[in-house]
Amino acid sequence: MDATFWAFIALVIFVVIVVYMKVPGMIGRTLDERADRIKKELEEARTLREEAQQLLAEYHRKRKEAEKEAGDIVASAEREAKALLEEAKRATEEYVARRNKLAEQKIATAETDAINAVRASAVDLAVAAAGSILAEKVDAKAAGNLFNDALAQVKSHLN
């Protein structure tokens, strides 16, 4: 019996002890448990990935909605600003038109007042000139006749 035989016997005894101790079953169970744990982790990872994709899709949808809403808000603000600008322009034009009309009325009033003042001055000047001419050229008898004629005209107009 040589050393190879004893090595073979030791190997057989070792294998019998390993089988008797149910080491292959323990190894199999351990590997099965590990495989189950890995499957479970893979399934959990797949579930998490699907949830992440759903969340990503939802965030993309919400972002698009937010962008659309922001665009609508900007468009609405632009419309309101344009309307306010047009209203301000219209109000300014009305104000300018009223001010121009008021200025034209004041100018017309000033012209009328100036014309009346010139006429009044002309009448006063004419009366003064006529008075001075009459004073130079009319004697007492002619003045009495003129006074009587004027008095008669006033009486005829009053009756």
From Swiss-Prot:
One GO cellular component, as annotated: proton-transporting ATP synthase complex
Localization terms from the record: Cell inner membrane
Transmembrane segments: 1-21
Molecular function per GO: proton-transporting ATP synthase activity, rotational mechanism; proton-transporting ATPase activity, rotational mechanism
Topology of the protein relative to the lipid bilayer: Single-pass membrane protein
Keywords: ATP synthesis, Cell inner membrane, Cell membrane, CF(0), Hydrogen ion transport, Ion transport, Membrane, Transmembrane, Transmembrane helix, Transport
Domain of life: Bacteria
Record-linked Pfam families: ATP-synt_B
Stored InterPro entries: ATP_synth_b/b'su_bac/chlpt (IPR002146), ATP_synthase_B_chain (IPR050059)
Coiled coil (residue ranges): none
NCBIfam families: PRK09173.1
Subunit and interaction comment: F-type ATPases have 2 components, F(1) - the catalytic core - and F(0) - the membrane proton channel. F(1) has five subunits: alpha(3), beta(3), gamma(1), delta(1), epsilon(1). F(0) has three main subunits: a(1), b(2) and c(10-14). The alpha and beta chains form an alternating ring which encloses part of the gamma chain. F(1) is attached to F(0) by a central stalk formed by the gamma and epsilon chains, while a peripheral stalk is formed by the delta and b chains.
PANTHER family documented for this protein: ATP SYNTHASE SUBUNIT B (PTHR33445:SF1), ATP SYNTHASE SUBUNIT B', CHLOROPLASTIC (PTHR33445)
Family: Belongs to the ATPase B chain family.
Function in brief: F(1)F(0) ATP synthase produces ATP from ADP in the presence of a proton or sodium gradient. F-type ATPases consist of two structural domains, F(1) containing the extramembraneous catalytic core and F(0) containing the membrane proton channel, linked together by a central stalk and a peripheral stalk. During catalysis, ATP synthesis in the catalytic domain of F(1) is coupled via a rotary mechanism of the central stalk subunits to proton translocation.
Protein name per its UniProtKB record: ATP synthase subunit b 2
